[in-house]
Structures are given as C-alpha cells and as structure tokens.
Amino acid sequence: MKKTLIAGVLFALCSQGAMAANDWRFAAGADVWNAKGSGQVYGASTNYDDHYNWNGYLQLEHGIIFLPNAKFEISDFSTSGGAFKNELTASDLNLYYRLFNNDLFKIDLGLTGRYYDGELTSYGRKGYDKDTVMAYAGSELYIPNTGFAFFGDLRTHDVDNYDYRLGASYKFSNMPVKLRAGWREANVDFDNVDQRIDGWFTGGEFTF
C-alpha cells in the first residue's frame, strides 16, 4: 500500500512536470515607435520634433502555478527639438500572474519594477535617474480561427506616472511570428522631469 502510494505521488509529480514543461514559452519582441514629446525637464522645454523611438523585450511564461511569469523590457523615451535633447530609457522587470487564459481572452496582473536613466542636453548636460514600482495589467482578446487579436497593457504608479499600449496583432499559423501595431502613451513625472510621450508603434514578436 505504501509503495503504491509513493508510486502514485511520483507519477503525479512527473505528470505535472511534463505539463509544466509543455506550458513553457519564451518570446522576444521589438517595436518602432513614432513618438512625440511634450512637457519639460529641469525647466527646459522646446518645440518637440517627431522622434523614432524603440523598445525590445524578452518574455518567459510557464506552467508553474505559484511562480510569476516574467518579462524584461527596455523602452526608449527620448525626446528632442532644437538645442534640447532628453535621452531617457526605462528598464522594466514585469512579474505577473495569468488570472484567465482561454480561447477567447487572457488577463494578467502583477507588478513592474522600473528604472529610469536619463541625460538632458540643453546648453549643458545633466544626468538623472529614478527607481519606481508600478502596478501592471495586461489583456488580449482573440478573434477565433483568424489569428487576429486585440491587446492592451498598463503600468501605473499614480495618475501622473503611467504607460499604456492599445493595439491589434496577427499571429501566423505556420510560423512562430506575431505582427502588431497600436498606440502607446507614457507620462513621466518625478523630481524635475515632467514629460509625456505618445504615438503610433509597429513591431513583431518571435516565440521559441
């Protein structure tokens, strides 16, 4: 009886391990963002130009119930115009749980640790940085049997510090590639930095 129980437990653990292994997903993606800024940095402002920014990410999802999924992302929030140039990047570590996942939609909730690293050039140079923690939510709504989906995600610390995306995507049925496009808006407000960056983006994702 004892041997049977041990064998049953081992079989259950192996089955769960195999299920978790099948649920593992690793993805890499990047976007190009036609963004424009507004606001000021250390009291300096300008007539902002359109700016081609970028972001890239690595994402790991799995079937282990109690461990969060993870996504590391770097986004370029730089803005410029005339003698004004604000080079700003945001590095994010998103840890989240998938609350719902079915053939029609998925919903994620978690936290984001964000690190800002910037340098202002405006008749001189001024470096600055900032750490913050933000609430994270993401969702995707699928159109069955088409490969198309609508998606959105939000990171927010308060009403003056947020970053959201809304868009649509298409996943090819015969290759692990997804194309996407949409709108992104980020508002950054800390210390002597008060800027908003928004615009249309397009990009893709490759799943391993």
Predicted features along the sequence, with ranges:
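Outer-membrane beta-barrel translocator/channel fold
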Residues: L111-Y123, M175-F208
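Solvent-exposed loop/turn segments connecting transmembrane beta-strands
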Residues: Y48-D49, S80-E87, D103, D129-V133, ...
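Cleavable N-terminal export/targeting peptides
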Residues: M1-A27
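Gram-negative (and chloroplast) outer-membrane scaffold detector with strong preference
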Residues: I64-F148
